[in-house]
A protein has these predicted regions:
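Asp-based, Mg2+/Mn2+-dependent phosphohydrolase catalytic module
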Residues: 1-9, 40, 87-92, 114, ...
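N-terminal helical cap/lid subdomain that shapes the substrate entry/recognition surface
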Residues: 2-114
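Switch/coupling loops of ABC transporter nucleotide-binding domains
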Residues: 124
């Protein structure tokens, strides 16, 4: 990767879960909490919660990632209770367990990613481009990540969502560089890699287990399995 002068990071899935889709982390949390539903039932409640969060303002700007997770788990488990798949009486108890498990998992991933982010921060300007709920600044501050990023481009704030390439164009604009001089690091082929390449950016796809088998089957010359491989690719 030559002539890179700035870097755009995705957040969720890229920095906080080693490229693994967040549904998989939450599913692991369900196992820890001994929530006895099928994977199909879980995926249904996961989608329900995502749509509810998009439709109704539950997440406020001051909420950190634990706050977000607890709200999300209450919605997911509430849905399962409404479907008579779990007992309403256990919703709060189990929501607390899953939220804590997921928050701890995210913090561990963030700390693993920190040396790489730090190394890149020392060499390049960094911008974060994320589909998020309007609270990514609070999430970053809680994980002590905010200072690494020159600017944050968040979907809920700018009114553009991935995979619209315009959200990456805003990130490039924030770096005051040409797209060809920018490396985009993300975990989603459809939401990060394709739109970033559409506007001419270089890419690094941190590929973990995705949401669908179709995405898992996709290949690309710029796949990395760990975030720190970016350091090698950039020759740092």
């Amino acid at each position: 990767m030559e002539n890179i002068k700035g870097i755009i990071f995705d957040y969720g899935g890229t920095i906080d879960s080693r490229g693994v889709h967040w549904s998989e982390i939450i599913w692991d949390g369900y196992q820890v909490a001994q929530i006895n539903v099928t994977k199909e039932q879980f995926r249904e409640c996961y989608v329900f919660a995502e749509r509810e969060l998009a439709r109704t303002l539950h997440i406020l700007p001051h909420h950190n990632f634990y706050d977000l997770l607890l709200i999300k788990m209450r919605i997911e488990l509430g849905y399962l209770a409404e479907q008579s798949l779990i007992d309403t009486a256990i919703v709060e108890e189990k929501a607390l367990i899953v939220a804590q498990y997921c928050y701890d998992a995210a913090r561990q991933c963030v700390e693993e990613a920190r040396p790489t982010i730090e190394a890149l921060y020392n060499k390049f300007p960094l911008v974060l481009v994320s589909n998020f709920y309007g609270n990514v600044e609070s999430v970053l501050a809680d994980f002590d990540l905010r200072h690494y990023f020159k600017e944050i481009v968040e979907s809920a704030v700018v009114g553009i969502r991935k995979p619209d390439p315009r959200i990456f164009a805003l990130g490039v604009e924030a770096l005051a560089l040409n797209p060809q001089e920018v490396l985009v690091i993300g975990d989603s082929y459809k939401k990060d890699i394709v739109p970033a390449e559409t506007i001419g950016c270089k890419v690094a796809w941190i590929k973990g287990k995705g949401w669908t088998a179709d995405e898992d089957a996709v290949t690309h010359p710029c796949i990395i399995s760990k975030l720190n491989e970016v350091i090698i690719k950039l020759g740092l």
